[in-house]
């Protein structure tokens, strides 16, 4: 049947289905209740089926939102046997998520990758249409998975169609998908639809109903029936009520004409979180007292009046309401005793389904009941084990409400808040902690409240005194015997020392508390806390201990991540890269994309500081993308500022301006010093590379001013060489003597490789001619094996100095070496400077042509690098959370960009092969 008034909408859906073989995608359909979303979906399903597509559907139901992966189970049921085709670790994650198998809790993103690959395998046989109706009622775990999948369909023969009601929050809000917003029908279409369903209406009644329906298709089909009922003596629906309420009342009014047994069945069905007719019939018999089922064992006869009235559909043992408003109308019309009776009856027929059973028990319970609360807590544990963190939060929250013991109630609220922090649900965390704070808490519970309140935004919105207070709290908690909690609290305090500047006294207090916890000398938490709180004062201790440790190569990713970030803070970028790289390996396997984004950011920053742009570019891009996807806005801003620094090193001033502006929109609003400092560094390095030395000095000088919002304690130590380079070239070297004295003093306290490499470079630049050569040679004779960028910059500066001393022949070897290194690293501005100096020395030097870093996008570069290492498309896809088909599509675009025809040409094209 043609959908009246929806020609443009159906055309768009038809095009989406028709081009699925060439290009996949997703579309969000939004609109008011009854506006025709389901009708459009039915049209798309019919077209897809006729075109040979496999159709997989799921529908959100309000009473299922607490069941982890309930929507996903429905969606994947027809292709469940294909799970054997995906990678073993993904198989395990998906089976654990869907069945609650006794296994380690899978990360939701690993489950999502498994789903993407499972559906992609199905699409190898026939293109797939995924349908998610009423997305606003899907459980949180399913929502996370669908959001992940929807963003990765462009290269797949898969289309995802999702619907959501206007004004209802859902995963579509953050998915950034193309949208189809349904408006009311035009006047002509509305009149045609009304004539189709009520051809005999009088003109006056027709005009009134058209005005009241306001172009809503469901209203145009249901309000005439309500009008007919009122004409037979029923109460008319007030025209001033909102349309949705009037429709619900219209459905409710139709219930009164049904037999009592039918009404009972519909009431139970409205509260059932399953479409199983057998469950509904058994529970309805329990409510009515006919437990033996002597009247109508299957319930089918009692349902016939509801089917005839157009309220429900019954097919193959499944009962479905024709529209969600019918379900909500029945629910709203029930009294509390009726709802409790229906829930108790449903709980009674769900033996062997512990999670569903306890939620029905809970819904039938108004007063505190520890037995139900304990069952809900057990359900939370099961949900968490399956990766259903949102469901676990809901179960613990409800368990707290039903707890008889106030202390248990507090523990459950605090555990729920802790899990909600993992989800990034700030409002939920605040609500749970506010409830907990009203109870008579123990000292430890109060400490957990304080700690959890500061878990968002790295303490950016707190006062500077809060860092000291947090350290004091950790000290008291440790004294009370809970060292693990004390460490977590102290780690929060240490992170605040990075994101803000609490002052030297507070930093050293954090150190004092940490060193008083009697942790093992090589404990990763201790080393990370010391590095964040006192990168100079405890730099020697951290670097010495880090040097004794070996990365786990993915076996202990959390430890590797902590050690990698600690190494960053103390300026040991070579160690940072080693530990962070190991963390990336482990976190990829585990599917922990939130932490993976952070470790990739650390990898990008360390690689950029070492000058390895081939590693820094893709790591930063992936970190930024995952930071956005996992809702980490401050990390996203930080990585944007790091990308700006990379842009400066590549010689792309337009990109630097774009990225610094984006980073500072967040950084300035929250006074995030690391973001502002790196944005300023990017500006300074862009100017330095472009030969604008005075401008570079002005930008870089701000990093060393303690009252400037761009001041960051650790970063200033590792940029002293940049500042002096700019100062010397613009004749302002006298203005950096004070900074040099401070940095020399810092160098006496820490063996930081970055600080000492910068100091050696700076000393040579500032030296009188009589000492300059000695200091340049000292700088070059240091072990800079892992630091090619600073070595090449020193060679460039030495060559410049030699040429100014009229030793052109001596300068050329250093200038050539610098040029070759800069070319290899991709730091074009410094390559150009080396070429200029070579030409000034009397040696010609042609311009470097573009390489793979210039021709490929960051993600293409990353895929090309992995393929050059010998990884298969499937292996690359598993690492990057893409399907193998998407990887293949990328490679087909990469080959012509690099002028090659096969994978064997990747190594030479990237400069990594023979």
Please report, for each region that a protein language model flagged, where it lies by residue.
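Conserved phosphate-binding/catalytic loops and adjacent sensor/switch elements of nucleotide-binding enzymes
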Residues: 40-127, 137
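Internal alpha-solenoid helical repeat scaffolds
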Residues: 46-51, 171, 203, 290-301, ...
């Amino acid at each position: 049947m043609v959908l009246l008034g929806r020609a443009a909408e159906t055309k768009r859906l038809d095009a989406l289905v028709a081009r699925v073989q060439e290009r996949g995608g997703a579309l969000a359909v939004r609109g008011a209740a009854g506006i025709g979303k389901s009708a459009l979906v039915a049209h798309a399903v019919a077209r897809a089926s006729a075109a040979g597509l496999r159709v997989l559907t799921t529908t959100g139901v309000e009473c299922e939102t607490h069941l982890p992966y309930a929507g996903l189970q429905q969606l994947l049921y027809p292709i469940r046997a294909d799970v054997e085709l995906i990678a073993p670790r993904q198989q395990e994650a998906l089976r654990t998520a869907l069945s609650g198998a006794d296994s380690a809790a899978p990360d939701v993103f690993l489950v999502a990758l498994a789903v993407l690959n499972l559906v992609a395998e199905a699409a190898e046989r026939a293109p797939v249409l995924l349908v998610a109706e009423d997305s606003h009622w899907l459980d949180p775990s399913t929502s996370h998975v669908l959001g992940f999948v929807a963003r990765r369909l462009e290269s797949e023969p898969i289309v995802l169609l999702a619907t959501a009601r206007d004004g209802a929050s859902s995963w579509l809000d953050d998915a950034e998908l193309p949208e189809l917003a349904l408006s009311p029908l035009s006047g002509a279409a509305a009149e045609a639809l009304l004539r189709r369903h009520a051809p005999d209406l009088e003109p006056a009644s027709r005009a009134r109903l058209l005005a009241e329906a306001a172009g809503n298709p469901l209203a145009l089909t249901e309000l005439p029936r309500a009008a007919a009922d009122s004409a037979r003596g029923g109460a008319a629906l007030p025209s001033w009520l909102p349309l949705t309420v009037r429709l619900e009342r219209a459905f409710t009014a139709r219930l009164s004409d049904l037999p009592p047994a039918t009404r009972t069945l519909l009431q139970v069905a409205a509260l059932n979180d399953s479409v199983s007719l057998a469950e509904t019939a058994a529970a309805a018999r329990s409510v009515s007292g006919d437990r033996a089922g002597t009247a109508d064992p299957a319930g089918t006869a009692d349902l016939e009046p509801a089917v005839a009235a157009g309220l429900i559909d019954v097919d193959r043992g499944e009962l479905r309401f024709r529209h969600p408003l019918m379900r909500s109308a029945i629910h709203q019309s029930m009294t509390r005793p009726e709802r409790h009776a229906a829930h108790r009856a449903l709980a009674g027929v769900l033996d062997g389904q512990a999670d569903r059973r306890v939620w029905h028990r809970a819904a039938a319970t108004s007063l505190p009941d520890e037995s139900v609360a304990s069952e809900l807590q057990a359900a939370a544990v099961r949900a968490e084990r399956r990766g259903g963190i949102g469901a676990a939060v809901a179960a613990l929250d409800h368990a707290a409400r039903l707890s008889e013991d106030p202390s248990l109630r507090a523990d459950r609220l605090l555990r729920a808040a802790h899990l909600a922090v993992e989800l990034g649900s700030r409002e939920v965390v605040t609500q749970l902690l506010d409830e907990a704070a009203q109870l008579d808490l123990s000292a430890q519970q109060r400490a957990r409240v304080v700690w959890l309140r500061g878990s968002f935004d790295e303490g950016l919105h707190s006062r500077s005194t809060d860092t000291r207070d947090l350290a004091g709290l950790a000290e008291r908690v440790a004294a009370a015997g809970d060292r693990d909690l004390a460490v977590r609290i102290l780690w929060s305090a240490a992170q605040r020392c990075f994101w803000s500047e609490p002052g030297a006294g507070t930093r050293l207090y954090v150190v004092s508390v940490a060193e008083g916890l009697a942790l093992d000398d090589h404990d990763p938490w201790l080393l990370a806390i010391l590095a964040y709180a006192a990168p100079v004062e405890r730099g020697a201790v951290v670097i010495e201990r880090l040097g004794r440790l070996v990365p786990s190569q993915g076996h202990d990713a959390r430890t590797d991540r902590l050690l990698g970030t600690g190494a960053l803070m103390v300026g040991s970028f070579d160690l940072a890269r080693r530990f962070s790289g190991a963390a990336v390996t482990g976190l990829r396997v585990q599917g922990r994309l939130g932490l993976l984004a952070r470790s990739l950011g650390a990898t990008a920053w360390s690689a950029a500081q070492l000058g390895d742009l081939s590693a820094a570019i893709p790591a930063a891009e992936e970190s930024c993308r995952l930071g956005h996807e996992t809702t980490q806005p401050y990390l996203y801003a930080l990585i944007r500022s790091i990308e700006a620094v990379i842009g400066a090193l590549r010689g792309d001033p337009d990109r630097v301006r774009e990225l610094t502006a984006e980073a500072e929109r967040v950084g300035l609003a929250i006074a995030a010093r690391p973001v502002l400092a790196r944005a300023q560094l990017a500006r300074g390095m862009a100017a330095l590379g472009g030969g604008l030395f005075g401008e570079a000095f002005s930008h870089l000088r701000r990093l060393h001013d303690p009252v400037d919002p761009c001041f960051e304690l650790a970063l200033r130590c590792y940029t002293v060489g940049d500042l002096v380079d700019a100062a010397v070239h613009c004749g302002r070297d006298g203005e950096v003597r004070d900074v040099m004295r401070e940095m020399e003093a810092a160098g006496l306290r820490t063996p930081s490789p970055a600080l000492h490499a910068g100091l050696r470079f700076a000393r040579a630049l500032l030296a009188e001619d009589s000492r300059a050569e000695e200091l340049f040679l000292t700088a070059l004779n240091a072990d800079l094996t892992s630091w090619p960028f600073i070595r090449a910059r020193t060679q460039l500066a030495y060559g410049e100095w030699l040429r100014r001393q009229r030793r052109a022949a001596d300068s050329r070897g250093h200038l050539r070496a610098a040029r070759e290194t800069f070319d290899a690293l991709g730091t074009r501005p410094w390559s150009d400077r080396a070429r200029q100096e070579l030409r000034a020395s009397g040696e010609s030097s042609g311009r470097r042509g573009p390489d793979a870093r210039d021709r490929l996008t960051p993600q293409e570069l990353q895929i090309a690098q992995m393929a050059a290492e010998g990884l298969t498309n499937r292996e690359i896809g598993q690492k990057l959370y893409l399907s193998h088909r998407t990887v293949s599509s990328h490679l087909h675009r990469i080959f012509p960009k690099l002028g090659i025809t096969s994978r064997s040409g990747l190594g030479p094209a990237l400069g990594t092969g023979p």
